[in-house]
Amino acid sequence: MSLQNAEANLKEFGKELNLEGLAFDENHTCILGIDNTFSLHLTYEPNSDRLYLYSPILDGLPKDDPSKLKLYEALLEGSMLGGQMAGGGVGVAVKEELILMHCVLEMGSGADPSSLRRFAPLFVESVEKWRERAKNIIEGRDPGATGIPGGGPIGGGGQPRPPGKDDDNPKPGDRFIKI
């Protein structure tokens, strides 16, 4: 039943892309080229009833340790609880010099046949932002590992506030609604 859900999701996604006949191969994988810049891999895993989406963020790791550290910090910060990664995460294959961003869609009984169609644009947009961010870090054009695609200091300034000017700073709990 779950493979049928994954196939229905892929078919619905194919209709959205005007790619009728989109199907999984014998390994339950479908690979799509995105704007001739990167690939979107869709793999159904029958043992877990999950559809995995994954794409390369970077192919080739920085050679110098400071750039590598800055890149890893940005990726780790951005992937905390999936916050900047469409709810997913990131992994590094050091020997292969590859960084992949990934997400999972449940395909068990009752899975919505349009969940992939609705989710894929968000995932692709996030991959594009992280690819740009990684490129900027490697090229030395990223001012800080903030976890925000595009970099830059949080708040946009980066200048320390003069003493006594902390009134605009939120206090712990200010951004939360008490229920």
How would you describe each model-predicted region?
Residues 120, 124-128:
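Helix-rich interaction surfaces within compact, conserved domain-sized segments
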Residues 1-41:
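Charge-rich, low-complexity N-terminal segments
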